[in-house]
Protein backbone atom coordinates (compact mmCIF):
# COMPACT_ATOMS: atom_id res chain seq x y z
CA UNK A 1 0.00 0.00 0.00
CA UNK A 2 2.87 2.38 0.84
CA UNK A 3 4.38 1.66 -2.55
CA UNK A 4 1.08 2.49 -4.28
CA UNK A 5 0.77 5.75 -2.37
CA UNK A 6 4.36 6.65 -3.28
CA UNK A 7 3.68 5.93 -6.96
CA UNK A 8 0.50 8.04 -6.93
CA UNK A 9 2.36 10.93 -5.33
CA UNK A 10 5.11 10.60 -7.95
CA UNK A 11 2.51 10.68 -10.73
CA UNK A 12 0.85 13.77 -9.29
CA UNK A 13 4.21 15.53 -9.15
CA UNK A 14 4.88 14.45 -12.73
CA UNK A 15 1.56 15.84 -13.97
CA UNK A 16 2.05 19.12 -12.11
CA UNK A 17 5.52 19.37 -13.63
CA UNK A 18 4.30 18.68 -17.15
CA UNK A 19 1.46 21.18 -16.78
CA UNK A 20 4.13 23.65 -15.75
CA UNK A 21 6.11 22.79 -18.86
CA UNK A 22 3.53 24.68 -20.91
CA UNK A 23 4.35 27.88 -19.06
CA UNK A 24 8.01 27.16 -18.36
CA UNK A 25 9.17 29.44 -21.12
CA UNK A 26 7.81 32.34 -19.10
CA UNK A 27 10.89 31.81 -16.95
CA UNK A 28 12.91 33.71 -19.54
CA UNK A 29 13.79 37.21 -18.44
CA UNK A 30 10.89 39.57 -18.89
CA UNK A 31 11.50 42.57 -21.06
CA UNK A 32 12.78 41.56 -24.50
CA UNK A 33 10.18 41.18 -27.22
CA UNK A 34 10.62 39.27 -30.44
CA UNK A 35 9.40 39.10 -34.01
CA UNK A 36 8.51 36.14 -36.23
CA UNK A 37 8.32 36.56 -39.99
CA UNK A 38 8.51 34.19 -42.89
CA UNK A 39 7.35 32.96 -46.26
CA UNK A 40 5.49 29.92 -47.52
CA UNK A 41 6.78 27.67 -50.31
CA UNK A 42 5.38 26.80 -52.76
CA UNK A 43 3.90 30.27 -52.97
CA UNK A 44 0.21 30.38 -52.13
CA UNK A 45 -2.56 32.45 -50.68
CA UNK A 46 -2.87 31.41 -47.06
CA UNK A 47 -4.41 32.26 -43.74
CA UNK A 48 -1.71 32.25 -41.06
CA UNK A 49 -2.51 32.17 -37.34
CA UNK A 50 -0.01 32.28 -34.48
CA UNK A 51 -1.17 30.73 -31.21
CA UNK A 52 0.55 30.88 -27.85
CA UNK A 53 1.25 27.39 -26.52
CA UNK A 54 2.67 28.52 -23.19
CA UNK A 55 0.59 31.66 -22.57
CA UNK A 56 -2.66 33.14 -23.93
CA UNK A 57 -1.97 34.70 -27.33
CA UNK A 58 -3.52 34.70 -30.79
CA UNK A 59 -2.86 36.75 -33.91
CA UNK A 60 -3.70 36.18 -37.55
CA UNK A 61 -2.83 37.51 -40.97
CA UNK A 62 -3.44 36.72 -44.62
CA UNK A 63 -0.63 36.33 -47.13
CA UNK A 64 -0.70 36.51 -50.90
CA UNK A 65 1.60 34.37 -53.08
CA UNK A 66 5.17 35.56 -52.57
CA UNK A 67 4.40 37.89 -49.66
CA UNK A 68 5.64 37.41 -46.10
CA UNK A 69 3.80 37.05 -42.82
CA UNK A 70 4.97 38.94 -39.75
CA UNK A 71 4.09 38.89 -36.04
CA UNK A 72 5.64 41.53 -33.77
CA UNK A 73 6.04 42.24 -30.06
CA UNK A 74 6.08 38.60 -29.03
CA UNK A 75 7.00 37.47 -25.56
CA UNK A 76 9.42 34.55 -25.23
CA UNK A 77 7.80 31.14 -25.18
CA UNK A 78 6.37 28.34 -27.29
CA UNK A 79 4.07 29.13 -30.20
CA UNK A 80 2.26 27.25 -32.95
CA UNK A 81 1.87 28.57 -36.49
CA UNK A 82 -1.24 27.30 -38.28
CA UNK A 83 -1.34 27.68 -42.06
CA UNK A 84 -4.59 27.08 -43.95
CA UNK A 85 -4.45 26.91 -47.75
CA UNK A 86 -7.68 26.29 -49.62
CA UNK A 87 -7.52 23.00 -51.47
CA UNK A 88 -4.56 21.71 -49.43
CA UNK A 89 -5.82 21.91 -45.86
CA UNK A 90 -4.16 22.90 -42.61
CA UNK A 91 -0.50 22.58 -41.58
CA UNK A 92 1.09 23.40 -38.24
CA UNK A 93 4.60 24.47 -37.35
CA UNK A 94 5.94 24.85 -33.79
CA UNK A 95 8.09 27.90 -33.09
CA UNK A 96 10.14 28.46 -29.97
CA UNK A 97 10.89 32.11 -29.28
CA UNK A 98 13.83 33.07 -27.13
CA UNK A 99 17.39 34.45 -27.15
CA UNK A 100 19.00 31.42 -28.80
CA UNK A 101 16.41 31.02 -31.55
CA UNK A 102 15.88 34.71 -32.28
CA UNK A 103 19.48 35.87 -32.34
CA UNK A 104 20.95 39.25 -31.46
CA UNK A 105 18.21 41.35 -33.06
CA UNK A 106 15.32 39.35 -31.63
CA UNK A 107 14.01 38.24 -35.01
CA UNK A 108 13.14 34.81 -36.33
CA UNK A 109 12.69 34.27 -40.06
CA UNK A 110 11.05 31.06 -41.24
CA UNK A 111 10.95 29.54 -44.70
CA UNK A 112 8.11 27.03 -44.58
CA UNK A 113 8.59 24.46 -47.34
CA UNK A 114 5.26 22.70 -47.01
CA UNK A 115 4.72 19.24 -48.47
CA UNK A 116 1.34 17.60 -49.03
CA UNK A 117 2.11 15.26 -46.13
CA UNK A 118 2.32 18.30 -43.81
CA UNK A 119 -1.37 19.05 -44.31
CA UNK A 120 -4.47 17.64 -42.69
CA UNK A 121 -7.09 18.01 -45.41
CA UNK A 122 -10.43 16.46 -44.48
CA UNK A 123 -10.32 17.48 -40.83
CA UNK A 124 -9.22 21.00 -41.72
CA UNK A 125 -11.99 21.38 -44.25
CA UNK A 126 -14.47 20.22 -41.61
CA UNK A 127 -13.08 22.83 -39.24
CA UNK A 128 -13.34 25.62 -41.81
CA UNK A 129 -16.83 24.54 -42.90
CA UNK A 130 -19.48 26.28 -40.84
CA UNK A 131 -22.29 24.04 -39.58
CA UNK A 132 -25.90 25.19 -39.53
CA UNK A 133 -25.67 25.45 -35.76
CA UNK A 134 -22.68 27.75 -35.96
CA UNK A 135 -24.30 29.80 -38.74
CA UNK A 136 -27.00 30.72 -36.23
CA UNK A 137 -24.46 32.58 -34.07
CA UNK A 138 -25.48 36.22 -33.83
CA UNK A 139 -23.38 38.99 -35.40
CA UNK A 140 -22.92 40.52 -31.94
CA UNK A 141 -21.41 37.29 -30.59
CA UNK A 142 -19.08 37.06 -33.59
CA UNK A 143 -18.04 40.65 -33.01
CA UNK A 144 -17.25 39.84 -29.36
CA UNK A 145 -15.16 36.89 -30.54
CA UNK A 146 -13.18 38.94 -33.07
CA UNK A 147 -12.51 41.63 -30.49
CA UNK A 148 -11.36 38.97 -28.01
CA UNK A 149 -8.80 37.70 -30.51
CA UNK A 150 -7.56 41.27 -31.00
CA UNK A 151 -7.19 41.56 -27.22
CA UNK A 152 -5.14 38.37 -27.14
CA UNK A 153 -2.83 39.72 -29.85
CA UNK A 154 -2.19 42.67 -27.50
CA UNK A 155 -1.69 40.39 -24.45
CA UNK A 156 -4.87 41.79 -22.87
CA UNK A 157 -6.10 38.51 -21.42
CA UNK A 158 -8.68 39.84 -18.95
CA UNK A 159 -10.46 41.81 -21.65
CA UNK A 160 -10.37 38.80 -23.98
CA UNK A 161 -12.00 36.61 -21.34
CA UNK A 162 -14.75 39.16 -20.74
CA UNK A 163 -15.50 39.37 -24.46
CA UNK A 164 -15.52 35.59 -24.85
CA UNK A 165 -17.86 35.30 -21.87
CA UNK A 166 -20.13 37.81 -23.59
CA UNK A 167 -19.93 35.80 -26.82
CA UNK A 168 -21.05 32.52 -25.24
CA UNK A 169 -23.76 34.30 -23.26
CA UNK A 170 -25.16 35.68 -26.52
CA UNK A 171 -24.62 32.40 -28.39
CA UNK A 172 -24.25 29.34 -26.11
CA UNK A 173 -23.58 27.16 -29.19
CA UNK A 174 -20.39 29.11 -30.02
CA UNK A 175 -17.92 26.20 -29.81
CA UNK A 176 -14.82 28.17 -30.84
CA UNK A 177 -15.45 30.75 -28.11
CA UNK A 178 -15.86 28.01 -25.49
CA UNK A 179 -12.63 26.39 -26.71
CA UNK A 180 -10.73 29.67 -26.43
CA UNK A 181 -12.08 30.22 -22.92
CA UNK A 182 -10.89 26.73 -22.01
CA UNK A 183 -7.45 27.31 -23.48
CA UNK A 184 -6.98 30.53 -21.53
CA UNK A 185 -8.22 28.87 -18.34
CA UNK A 186 -5.78 25.98 -18.83
CA UNK A 187 -2.83 28.24 -19.55
CA UNK A 188 -3.57 30.23 -16.39
CA UNK A 189 -3.91 27.15 -14.17
CA UNK A 190 -7.73 27.15 -13.80
CA UNK A 191 -8.18 23.50 -14.68
CA UNK A 192 -11.76 23.05 -13.42
CA UNK A 193 -12.90 25.94 -15.58
CA UNK A 194 -10.87 24.65 -18.53
CA UNK A 195 -12.56 21.25 -18.32
CA UNK A 196 -15.99 22.88 -18.13
CA UNK A 197 -15.31 25.00 -21.22
CA UNK A 198 -13.80 22.19 -23.30
CA UNK A 199 -16.73 19.91 -22.49
CA UNK A 200 -19.14 22.62 -23.60
CA UNK A 201 -17.15 23.27 -26.78
CA UNK A 202 -17.29 19.58 -27.67
CA UNK A 203 -20.98 19.35 -26.79
CA UNK A 204 -21.79 22.26 -29.09
CA UNK A 205 -19.59 20.99 -31.95
CA UNK A 206 -18.87 17.24 -31.65
CA UNK A 207 -16.61 17.40 -34.76
CA UNK A 208 -14.22 19.84 -33.09
CA UNK A 209 -10.85 18.11 -32.87
CA UNK A 210 -9.41 21.03 -30.89
CA UNK A 211 -12.04 20.69 -28.17
CA UNK A 212 -11.54 16.90 -28.11
CA UNK A 213 -7.77 16.96 -27.74
CA UNK A 214 -7.88 19.88 -25.29
CA UNK A 215 -10.37 18.06 -23.08
CA UNK A 216 -8.09 15.03 -23.15
CA UNK A 217 -5.21 17.23 -22.03
CA UNK A 218 -6.93 18.83 -19.06
CA UNK A 219 -8.27 15.45 -17.90
CA UNK A 220 -4.68 14.18 -17.72
CA UNK A 221 -3.68 17.21 -15.69
CA UNK A 222 -6.59 16.61 -13.31
CA UNK A 223 -5.62 12.91 -12.98
CA UNK A 224 -8.99 11.76 -14.35
CA UNK A 225 -7.16 9.00 -16.15
CA UNK A 226 -10.04 6.76 -17.26
CA UNK A 227 -11.67 9.64 -19.11
CA UNK A 228 -8.29 10.92 -20.29
CA UNK A 229 -7.56 7.54 -21.86
CA UNK A 230 -10.92 7.61 -23.64
CA UNK A 231 -10.70 11.15 -25.03
CA UNK A 232 -7.02 11.01 -25.95
CA UNK A 233 -7.61 7.66 -27.63
CA UNK A 234 -10.41 9.23 -29.64
CA UNK A 235 -8.11 12.10 -30.60
CA UNK A 236 -5.43 9.72 -31.88
CA UNK A 237 -8.02 7.80 -33.89
CA UNK A 238 -9.30 11.07 -35.37
CA UNK A 239 -5.84 12.39 -36.23
CA UNK A 240 -3.09 9.76 -35.89
CA UNK A 241 -0.51 12.24 -37.21
CA UNK A 242 -1.24 14.85 -34.55
CA UNK A 243 1.71 15.16 -32.17
CA UNK A 244 -0.33 16.57 -29.28
CA UNK A 245 -2.83 13.70 -29.39
CA UNK A 246 -0.04 11.11 -29.48
CA UNK A 247 1.90 12.86 -26.71
CA UNK A 248 -1.11 13.11 -24.40
CA UNK A 249 -2.07 9.48 -24.99
CA UNK A 250 1.52 8.48 -24.24
CA UNK A 251 1.46 10.49 -21.00
CA UNK A 252 -1.85 8.88 -20.02
CA UNK A 253 -0.44 5.40 -20.55
CA UNK A 254 2.63 6.38 -18.52
CA UNK A 255 0.49 7.50 -15.61
CA UNK A 256 -1.51 4.26 -15.54
CA UNK A 257 1.70 2.23 -15.69
CA UNK A 258 1.51 0.91 -19.28
CA UNK A 259 5.07 1.83 -20.15
CA UNK A 260 5.34 -0.03 -23.45
CA UNK A 261 2.24 1.69 -24.85
CA UNK A 262 3.43 4.99 -23.41
CA UNK A 263 6.77 4.60 -25.18
CA UNK A 264 5.04 3.75 -28.46
CA UNK A 265 2.89 6.88 -28.50
CA UNK A 266 5.57 9.21 -27.15
CA UNK A 267 8.02 8.05 -29.82
CA UNK A 268 5.34 8.59 -32.46
CA UNK A 269 4.79 12.13 -31.15
CA UNK A 270 8.53 12.83 -31.38
CA UNK A 271 8.70 11.40 -34.90
CA UNK A 272 5.77 13.58 -36.00
CA UNK A 273 7.07 16.75 -34.36
CA UNK A 274 10.32 16.63 -32.35
CA UNK A 275 9.87 20.31 -31.42
CA UNK A 276 6.34 19.90 -30.06
CA UNK A 277 5.47 22.14 -27.12
CA UNK A 278 4.18 19.18 -25.03
CA UNK A 279 7.81 17.96 -24.84
CA UNK A 280 7.19 14.19 -25.07
CA UNK A 281 10.93 13.63 -24.61
CA UNK A 282 10.63 14.52 -20.93
CA UNK A 283 8.14 11.72 -20.25
CA UNK A 284 10.19 9.29 -22.34
CA UNK A 285 13.20 10.25 -20.21
CA UNK A 286 11.27 9.23 -17.07
CA UNK A 287 10.33 5.91 -18.66
CA UNK A 288 13.95 5.08 -19.49
CA UNK A 289 14.93 5.87 -15.89
CA UNK A 290 12.20 3.61 -14.51
CA UNK A 291 13.32 0.83 -16.84
CA UNK A 292 16.93 1.20 -15.67
CA UNK A 293 18.36 2.49 -18.95
CA UNK A 294 20.48 5.55 -18.07
CA UNK A 295 22.15 5.81 -21.49
CA UNK A 296 18.81 5.98 -23.28
CA UNK A 297 17.59 8.54 -20.72
CA UNK A 298 20.69 10.68 -21.30
CA UNK A 299 20.24 10.43 -25.07
CA UNK A 300 16.66 11.69 -24.86
CA UNK A 301 17.75 14.68 -22.76
CA UNK A 302 20.59 15.48 -25.17
CA UNK A 303 18.17 15.44 -28.09
CA UNK A 304 15.76 17.66 -26.15
CA UNK A 305 18.42 20.27 -25.36
CA UNK A 306 19.57 20.32 -28.98
CA UNK A 307 16.04 21.25 -30.01
CA UNK A 308 15.30 23.58 -27.06
CA UNK A 309 18.50 25.55 -26.39
CA UNK A 310 16.63 28.22 -24.42
CA UNK A 311 15.15 25.76 -21.92
CA UNK A 312 15.23 27.49 -18.51
CA UNK A 313 16.68 24.45 -16.70
CA UNK A 314 19.23 23.52 -19.37
CA UNK A 315 22.15 23.71 -16.94
CA UNK A 316 20.53 21.21 -14.56
CA UNK A 317 19.76 18.92 -17.48
CA UNK A 318 23.38 18.95 -18.63
CA UNK A 319 24.47 17.96 -15.13
CA UNK A 320 21.93 15.14 -15.18
CA UNK A 321 23.26 13.93 -18.53
CA UNK A 322 26.83 13.83 -17.20
CA UNK A 323 25.66 11.87 -14.16
CA UNK A 324 23.70 9.39 -16.27
CA UNK A 325 26.61 8.84 -18.67
CA UNK A 326 28.90 8.05 -15.74
CA UNK A 327 26.75 5.17 -14.47
Regions found by a protein language model. Give the residues of each.
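Helix-start (N-cap) detector for alpha-helical repeat units in TPR-like alpha-solenoids
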Residues: 141, 175-176, 209-210, 243-244, ...
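Structured interaction patches on ligand/partner-binding surfaces of diverse proteins
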Residues: 30, 61, 86-111
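Canonical tetratricopeptide repeat
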Residues: 180, 214, 248, 283, ...
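Structural signature of tandem alpha-helical TPR/SEL1-like repeats
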Residues: 153-163, 187-200, 221-234, 256-268, ...
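Alpha-helical segment of the N-proximal tetratricopeptide repeat
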Residues: 133-176, 180-183, 187
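Short, acidic Ser/Thr/Gly-rich low-complexity loop/linker segments typical of extracellular
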Residues: 54-68
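A short, solvent-exposed beta-strand micro-motif common in secreted/extracellular proteins
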Residues: 77-87
Amino acid sequence: MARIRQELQSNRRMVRYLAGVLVASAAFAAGPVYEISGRILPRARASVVLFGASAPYSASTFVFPGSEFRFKKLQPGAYVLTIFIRGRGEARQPVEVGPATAGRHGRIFLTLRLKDSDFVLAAALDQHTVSAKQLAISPAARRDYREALKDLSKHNVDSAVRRLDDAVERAPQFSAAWNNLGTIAYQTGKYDRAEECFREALKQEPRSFEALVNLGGVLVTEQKLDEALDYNGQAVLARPNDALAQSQLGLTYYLIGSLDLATKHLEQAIEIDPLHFSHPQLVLFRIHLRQGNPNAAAGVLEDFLTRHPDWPWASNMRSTIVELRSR
